[in-house]
Structure formats: structure tokens, C-alpha cells
Amino acid sequence: MELIFLGTSAGVPTRTRNVTAILLNLQHPTQSGLWLFDCGEGTQHQLLHTAFNPGKLDKIFISHLHGDHLFGLPGLLCSRSMSGIIQPLTIYGPQGIREFVETALRISGSWTDYPLEIVEIGAGEILDDGLRKVTAYPLEHPLECYGYRIEEHDKPGALNAQALKAAGVPPGPLFQELKAGKTITLEDGRQINGADYLAAPVPGKALAIFGDTGPCDAALDLAKGVDVMVHEATLDITMEAKANSRGHSSTRQAATLAREAGVGMLIITHVSSRYDDKGCQHLLRECRSIFPATELANDFTVFNV
């Protein structure tokens, strides 16, 4: 999987940072996909600066209905239609997302020429496409807000081809059945169980993308053991009380959660517009003093998961 940050500013855009939007390129050889997490104002313009076509988008996940995470959605939906894109699109989001989209389209005289499904979610598993699942966790924010945990299913271990050949199994279609863990019967009547010739399963990758949040009970479950955790660091340690009063987190809180959850990497985003480049490096240093494996997302930064 590959993360591409389209917007990394909190609340309002700056000269160098747009408001929140994150692309997830699934990069699967047989079931690829492009997912978008949040869609702040100007997201479709940011998308033009990447190699990705809006027609490849098949799912959009909205964390909550504050404008800096949402106001780019109607324009993106309409432009997608005006470009002749007919591929279906599904939007997941909290209660009210359907009314927002339908109202924006209706009062502007707009429509989509592609199938559009809107799913209003609650806490719990919201998607399993056979290769990965997505679970929504409730966060601490003035509006109903969710974080999303994306988990790949474990992949089958490598097939021991040499041992199979030694057992008299010819390479070819039978190998595919054995790779799937099935039992086959050879011409001489012997039964070969594929599970006996498979290495241990390869654990799938896991990713946690937080919406806006202050410290909350669900955060640890959302982030526990993931390879990459994306979390806001809106304000520095000295302004922690202010951040929490508005349903946001400080650098210290983001980094402490990453350490307690045992994540592989913390990526901080959603930084206040009060911080210039020097200030953002200060936020990064504060996080790294607690959790060294921290990176700062800038607009168009790409991370591999």
C-alpha cells in the first residue's frame, strides 16, 4: 500500500499546505484500487498534481463533517461526472453525509453519471472485500468522527515446490490448488494436502488513519500494532490544553499513543496554520523525542506501508 498526502493543514489552507485529504493506493496485482480519506476544499486540484486519475477512485471515507475534511467532495463528484467517468463510487461517512451530498447536488442542479452509493456508518467493521477489511472507531471530537483501521488479510505462505516435485507432483494446475491449501489426489491414489507444503502465512499490513480527535478510549484499539499510524499533531506541547478543548491532540499525545500502541511508524499531519516550516520541524522534534519513528507529512509526500 502507498499513502499520498494531498492536504496536511488543520482548519484552513496555507500557502504550502491544503486542508485534509489522503490517498491510499492499494497496489494489489489483481485487485487494485484507489481510496480517498477525507476531501477538504481543493482536493480535486491537489489530485491534478499527482499521477492519479479521479476515475480510479472507487471509495471515499469521510471522518467527520467539518468543512476542512468535506467541502471538496461536491466538486470532486461533479468533475468526475463531467469528465465522462462511469466507474462506480462508494462514499462512507458518519450520519449526515448522505444529506450533505444529496443537498449539494440538488440545489446546484448537479448530478452524477456514474453509480454513487453513500453508506452512513457507525462503529465497527464497514467493509471486507476479501483482501482487506476496514473498521471504523469512534473518536473524541465535537462532531461525530471516526478513525479507520485498514487491515490486509494474511497472505498464503510460499509453496515448497521442490518438496512437491520430490513427492511426484508435477508442476502446473495442481500447484495452484495446493497453494490454496486444498487436498489433491494423484493418479496413484495418494492424497497430498497443500497445507503440509505451505510456509507460514505472511501477515498482512495494517494501517490506522485517524480523523480529528482528542485523547479517547478507542484510540489504542484503533492503532494497536499497526505498521503505520496517521494522526493529527495540531498543536505543540505548550498548547495541549487548547488542543484538547477543541477535540484535537498535541504532539506529545500523538507520539505517546504511537509508543503505547506499538506501531511501526507515526506520520503526523493536520498541523495548525500558525506553524511555518520551522515550526513544523519543531512539532516533529517534539514527537521524535517520545517516539523516534515519526515522520511529518507535507502535501504530496508519499509513504509506503
Curated annotation (Swiss-Prot):
Residue positions of the active site: 68
Obligatory cofactor(s): Zn(2+)
Disulfides per UniProt: none
EC number: 3.1.-.-
Keyword Nucleotide-binding annotated: no
Alphabetically ordered keywords of this record: Endonuclease, Exonuclease, Hydrolase, Metal-binding, Nuclease, tRNA processing, Zinc
Amino acids binding Zn(2+) 2: 68-69, 212, 270
Residue intervals passing through the bilayer: none
Residues reported to bind Zn(2+) 1: 64, 66, 141, 212
InterPro entries for this protein: Metallo-B-lactamas (IPR001279), RibonucZ/Hydroxyglut_hydro (IPR036866), Rnase_BN (IPR013469), RNase_Z/BN (IPR013471)
Cofactor: how and how many bound: Binds 2 Zn(2+) ions.
UniProt GO MF annotations: 3'-tRNA processing endoribonuclease activity; exonuclease activity; zinc ion binding
Subunit structure, interactors included: Homodimer.
Entries under HAMAP family matching the protein: RNase_Z_BN (MF_01818)
Family in the record: Belongs to the RNase Z family. RNase BN subfamily.
Role played: Zinc phosphodiesterase, which has both exoribonuclease and endoribonuclease activities.
Full protein name: Ribonuclease BN
Gene name linked to the record: rbn
